[in-house]
Amino acid sequence: MPLTKYKAACVTSEPCWFDLEAGVQKTINFINEAGAAGCKLIAFPEVWIPGYPYWMWKINYQQSLPMLKSYRENSLPMDSEEFRRIRRAARDNQIYVSLGFSEIDHATLYLAQALIGPTGEVINHRRKIKPTHVEKLVYGDGAGDTFKSVTQTELGRLGQLNCWENMNPFLKALNVSEGEQIHIAAWPVYPGKETLKYPDPATNVADPASDLVTPAYAIETGTWTLAPFQRLSVEGLKKTTPEGVEPETDPSTYNGHARIYKPDGTLVCKPDKDFDGLLFVDIDLNECHLAKALADFSGHYMRPDLIRLLVDTRRKELITEADTNGGIATYTTRERLGLNIPLDAQAPKQKATAADVPSSSVM
């Protein structure tokens, strides 16, 4: 039986730009803080490690190359000791971790999410199915075996999506069909509406993401919805601006956009613009019942005889090999990355390399 009542944490903080080691340690520090606070779940923003490359929206390809090189060098491989350290932190704190990160696999980057369980097991590994607009200059597409989201856990049926995936009606339909109860709507760093210039659509700033898309997801699916967001400082603006370009001086428009919503879309909490740390929420899964009793789009309020969604979870390979029986040999991304192997079987347990540094928190 899943727990029906527990505490969860939602991260709203500035990433460690272009610094994999510092980003891993800051992640572990937040996991430790959430664990010490009695949380059963902590949710991180989209590509929290090593930060969202928002510079790609503001400069041209040639200007971006030095930062792109550094970004790739500081992205996180899943079969690395850095990732195993994060898994150990989840195990040490007996906590579920929804981690957004720039995953490097061979020579391609992916907007990845991993759901790590309290034993350190990687329960779900997914990649954003389609990078948004200029994100295609940095990241590749997810595959059939890396896009499903909802997983049965002792905390209930938990799902996670990245950024504009949270307004994709087909992904929402897939998640709701699997009985999702808790949702991580992970967002990157985004400017606010005061920066909007016609004819750029309002969709392209943070306010609709926080105050329209995310509560709509909660209402349409009847889920507790946590929306972790990244932040920016003056120093962060300098680090994410290429040489020869004058950096912005006021980071406030990028901050204060994290949210937590109940299954009926009611706002639970949001941070002040100057807050950097963890938002806490007491989740009660029983509150999903009445929301879903009104509108359950996977059950009484849907007509699958009229409307159905085709889902293909097969991985399509560029090269396939024949197996010994004359068929086609297949494998999953999960198997290739060794995520099906228990944590202690992959590498000997090592101590963390930096001391725990507490972070700010808010209820």
Curated annotation (Swiss-Prot):
Residues forming the catalytic site: 46 (proton acceptor), 128, 163 (nucleophile)
Record GO terms (molecular function): cyanide hydratase activity; nitrilase activity
CDD domains: nitrilases_CHs
Biological process terms in GO annotation: cyanide catabolic process
UniProt keyword Phosphoprotein, yes or no: no
Cross-referenced PROSITE patterns: CN_HYDROLASE, NITRIL_CHT_1, NITRIL_CHT_2
Enzyme Commission no: 4.2.1.66
Keyword Hydrolase: yes
Residues of the CN hydrolase domain: 6-285
Enzyme class: lyase
Catalytic activity field: formamide = hydrogen cyanide + H2O
Oligomeric form and interacting partners: Oligomer of dimers, forming left-handed helical fibers.
Family: Belongs to the carbon-nitrogen hydrolase superfamily. Nitrilase family.
Protein name (Swiss-Prot/TrEMBL): Cyanide hydratase
Organism: Alternaria brassicicola (Dark leaf spot agent)
